[in-house]
């Protein structure tokens, strides 16, 4: 029996070459897919910044990181979100809503100037990722819970008027983050995971109500029902939410 080794070697070589080609094409596709998600994150970030419209603080810059320990955090450079976090949600359902929650929550701490998040110098530890176990009396657990409540309400409202259901998918996003990063559910001096979920859910209805009031105010303004529009925008401002659009629309309600 005569075996054609040359033909067999050629076949194996061809198969090996094709596998390399498939792998190369897969990597190109994956890289393109990841870039699309990163571009979406940039767009989401800008949309939320625009919805906040706060000129009292210079908008922080967005940065991506290849580290895999902090999820998202504030620093003197701005807001950083890890690529691992983006990849966690990339290509899955409600990607924009989940990423919007992460981003809006960090932006909330930035604009609300929650200095308890300060770690060392001008660096910060994220309320979602790299935790600070601070037992100092200056910022008690009660104060941290209040700050988290404020941040979720803030993130819910501004995320909603930017077009994202941030608090509707906040619990799902947090759960996936905790599991992916193997974060402990209990931390000394900080709200537990269950408390974070309770805080998030407790603020959902109020954030949605305020966002609905904002949309109603716009409808009233468009239909020349100026007194009702004034009530909507003033009620939102009395709840300590402001943006250029809210003030502009309130001003139009008085002028028209």
Regions found by a protein language model. Give the residues of each.
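A Zn2+-metalloprotease active-site environment signal
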Residues: 34-256
């Amino acid at each position: 029996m005569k075996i054609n080794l040359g033909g067999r070697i050629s076949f194996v070589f061809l198969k090996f070459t094709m596998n390399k080609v498939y792998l190369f094409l897969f990597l190109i596709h994956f890289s393109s897919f990841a870039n699309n998600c990163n571009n979406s994150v940039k767009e989401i970030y800008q949309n939320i910044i625009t919805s906040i419209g706060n000129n009292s603080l210079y908008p922080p810059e967005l940065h991506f990181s290849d580290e895999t320990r902090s999820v998202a955090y504030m620093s003197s450079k701005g807001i950083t979100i890890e690529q691992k976090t983006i990849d966690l949600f990339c290509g899955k359902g409600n990607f924009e809503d989940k990423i919007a929650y992460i981003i809006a929550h960090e932006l909330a701490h930035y604009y609300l100037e929650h200095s308890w998040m300060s770690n060392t110098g001008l660096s910060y530890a994220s309320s979602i990722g790299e935790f600070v176990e601070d037992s100092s009396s200056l910022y008690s657990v009660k104060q941290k819970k209040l700050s988290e409540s404020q941040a979720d309400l803030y993130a819910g409202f501004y995320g909603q008027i930017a077009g994202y259901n941030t608090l509707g998918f906040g619990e799902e996003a947090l759960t996936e983050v905790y599991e992916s990063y193997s974060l402990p559910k209990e931390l000394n001096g900080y709200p537990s995971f269950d408390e974070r979920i309770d805080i998030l859910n407790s603020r959902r209805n109020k954030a949605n109500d305020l966002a609905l009031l904002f949309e109603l105010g716009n409808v009233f303004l468009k239909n020349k029902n100026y007194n009702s529009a004034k009530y909507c925008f003033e009620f939102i401002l009395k709840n300590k939410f402001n943006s250029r659009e809210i003030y502009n629309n309130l001003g139009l309600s008085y002028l028209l």
